[in-house]
Design a protein with these regions (language model features):
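Mid-to-C-terminal alpha-helical segments outside catalytic/metal-binding sites
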Residues: 2-53, 247-248, 252-259, 267-309
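Mid-domain alpha/beta scaffold segments of enzyme catalytic cores
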Residues: 1-135, 139, 143
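Short, electropositive alpha-helical surface patch
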Residues: 69-74, 78, 207-214, 245-251, ...
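Conserved strand-to-helix beginnings and helix N-cap segments that scaffold or border functional pockets
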Residues: 66-67, 95-99, 130, 202-205, ...
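Active-site-proximal loop/turn and secondary-structure-junction residues that shape catalytic pockets
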Residues: 60, 86-88, 118-120, 153-155, ...
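Catalytic pocket-lining loop regions of alpha/beta-barrel enzymes
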Residues: 112-113, 125-259
Length: 309
């Protein structure tokens, strides 16, 4: 049906109409004008929150321009590094072009990592570790930059579902990741956004099965520590309900393979940039200073090859 789907730029939200009544949804925080959050806005937030450097993610909803990403880094070379975007859905039918674009992102524009959304299931149910993806991966892994992978729940399952099928789907995606890492075991790899915590919420706690930690037998795999954007509408600051999960991640993965992230500006729907630091640095009293130093910057610096200075 025609629901007149549209963007309310001034209010920074999407709007649609059903039976004469307008509905809206905020995915960006509601204070963004024209749905924009550029490099200057991020630097301002970083200055206020005491964040010295950021790794810029890419995603279809954020635009797909390596040229723009590179320009942000050029303007603020001491503040930004950037992932390169990949049009994953085009790999099936336009493999050579996607490979060419990726090579250009790294070799011409000088971007620092690769972002891959493992959600090609919108095109085909083929697993993303091999088959039609093999030529792409052969090139991607040869570029000698870290690869950041956003895992899905598998074909036909939404990431926000809290169901056994969602849990099973995610565990199967981890098996695909492990197969991929067997082939590219020397590639520095990181899982973005942490685990799909919503699928494993049980009352006021998160119950992660031991199987989610199996991929980390590969010492080259790390994971983002990113809670507010994923569960900030379920638990309140300082998110004490997730503290046992953070502790378990440190025990099973290691602080030297955990890196703090936020999904700015999306996470500002739930807390401030400073609070996304504070809930770990001020309230996770089970973390020693060495662990905090690694999670809050040391691990990311190592992955990106930054100097300790």
């Amino acid at each position: 049906p025609d629901v007149d789907f549209r963007i309310d730029h001034a209010a920074g939200r999407v709007v649609w109409t059903i039976d004469g009544e307008d509905y809206t949804k905020h995915y960006y925080p509601p204070n963004l004008q024209d749905c924009e959050f550029g490099a200057d806005s991020l630097v301002s937030e970083m200055d206020y929150a005491g964040v010295d450097m950021a790794l810029l993610h890419t995603n279809p909803m954020l635009g797909r321009s390596s040229t723009y990403q590179a320009e942000c880094v050029r303007r603020f070379p001491d503040r930004f590094r950037s992932m390169a975007p990949v049009d994953e859905w085009r790999i099936h039918d336009d493999t050579d072009a996607v490979i060419r674009e990726l090579e250009e992102s790294i070799t011409k524009h000088g971007l620092h990592a690769i972002k891959f959304n493992a959600n090609g299931y919108k095109i085909s149910d083929d697993p993303w570790d091999d088959g039609i993806y093999r030529p792409f991966w052969e090139t991607a892994t040869s570029l000698n930059v870290p690869i950041f992978i956003s895992l899905s729940m598998g074909p036909g399952i939404k990431s926000w579902e809290a169901s056994q099928s969602a849990q099973d789907g995610y565990l199967n995606e981890l098996k695909i990741l492990m197969r991929w890492m067997e082939r590219y075991s020397d590639t520095t790899t990181s899982i973005t956004h942490g685990f799909p915590y919503r699928a494993f919420i049980d009352g006021d706690s998160i119950n992660l099965p031991d199987a989610v930690f199996e991929p980390f037998q590969n010492p080259n795999l790390s994971m983002e520590v990113c809670f507010p954007v994923r569960i900030g509408d379920t638990f309140d600051f300082p998110y004490r309900e997730v503290f046992p999960t953070i502790q378990s991640m440190v025990e099973h993965i290691g602080a030297d393979r955990l890196l703090w992230g936020t999904d700015m500006p999306f996470q500002n729907r739930h807390c401030t940039y400073r609070q996304s630091r504070d809930h770990i640095e001020k309230y996770c009293d089970f973390l020693g200073q060495d662990d905090l130093d690694l999670i809050m910057g040391g691990t990311a610096s190592r992955i990106l090859g930054l100097s300790k200075d």
